[in-house]
């Protein structure tokens, strides 16, 4: 506790020191430190607009220095602090370049550009009569920039039309029930928005490519927009253009047009020995499996049956961009290949329909790996060391099965101990190393649903996996020794890109505790039934269901996102129901397995995290966790391993795990 208070005092003193430095101390005469941008939208007029102040702030060309928690000018203060010191010192350079931030000075040219960008942004979002007036409020050596924005009324869509250069393409819209084509996002009443128009172009292009039009690109969609309509309305005509082919004949460029045609898959070729460097390898053997042609050296690296379950285009299918992308994602999810490329080649025509060969080139990753890790720890003055060896096999049975075997161990010297009441306990093992842990974990992950119903498939579900694991662990503490055996069988799957569902019908644990006499006496003296039951031998036979969701955008590392997880666990209820028919031993209302009362409870928890991205390497995270467990008839308390606690790397890090 003393260490924490000391650390907090240092942080407060550092912030005070940084703030005490005059922010404008290094601002040259005639320059002004930009302290604030203020955007005034429509003054006091009650003109409704969907434009937010944050959205407008993002387009400004000049922004003030960042502030810690939005209040403290920390980064500028650090820069000022380091600027007057020896620049050759590494620590000074680190403070100035990595932590600090140079003062942002006012530039009139950027103020003008910001006003232009605001006007452009408003025009792009349907405010064609927008007006922006700027003012610079100068005070001594600092300045505030004020933007007075009059958005005007929004322009809304009155009428939407379509125009086609090819009647065959038109047939995909007229009377077509395809949701991607029939339900356009653009409709009467929509506010003019260039971003939405671009998204509509992308969505329509994808929809047509999924229908077999592999030559169709975004450039083949253009918009004719008429804003000269009374009442703040506009009309749109979406034009679908044919292919443009440019040729040069006798030095003269000529452009010819051709209609877009649906393409069909003539065949699928899987090359499991593709050479990334372009060098030709040995002669490959060819094998046909379910209409797919496989090329490999003698025995295929991964069984064709496993690859087939991850291919979603077959001979005779129409080309589909979504199915091609899904195929790539599923093969990538196997974790067996380090290079994946899917290409299409023209293969003539069949009954007037253009044909494509789909070629899947794969280059395998190293099959086996061995890693060694070691770490030193210092938790509240308790020194320790831990090590682990991890063996990985990415293709154990030639079906992309991931096998992991981990052996680990750790030692720690706990020089103090706390009793149940929070007082210092003098009963400690007088050895240099009085805390240890060692064990082993074995897991096998199969990229499929093991034991699924015959003939049943879930093609829309992403990355179906079955995980089987076994763990053995022994912990030694000053108060007790603990032995754990755990085995788990679970399925995981993704319904969408951003969520995951986990179902574990089997999660069995056996925990044995060997308590010291002094610790046993402490438990008995506490008369706390909850603690006594928690620190006793127990058997857990659980079933678990969990769902998680995240809005993280992996294409935009600077975008804020959130994550939440819901979990429900039920233990011992089925076992309790069959205990009497099975004639299990009963003691004091609890049924026993080998003299141990098995756990019976229901438990639910919820976790929420909000990530505020500061830079590419730092973020501010808010975490909320709530849970509830209800012990049932067979046992009066939750087992120690399944009880709720705080502290540790996944909780409040200032305290050790289970210290709160």
Tell me the role of every PLM-derived stretch:
Residues 5-14:
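Sec-dependent N-terminal signal peptides
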Residues 281-283, 293, 377-380, 502-660:
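C-terminal outer-membrane beta-barrel translocator/porin domains of Gram-negative envelope proteins
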Residues 156-159, 368-372, 589-591:
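Short small-residue beta-strand/loop micro-motif enriched in glycine and branched aliphatics
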Residues 300-301, 320-565, 653-654:
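Gram-negative/organellar outer-membrane beta-barrel architecture
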Residues 2-5, 22-333, 342:
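Interaction-mediating elements
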Residues 127-131, 214-218, 383-387, 438, ...:
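Amphipathic hydrophobic-ligand
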Residues 43, 147-153, 164-166, 238-244, ...:
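Flexible glycine-/small-residue-rich
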Residues 17-20:
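C-terminal motif of bacterial Sec signal peptides marking the signal peptidase cleavage site
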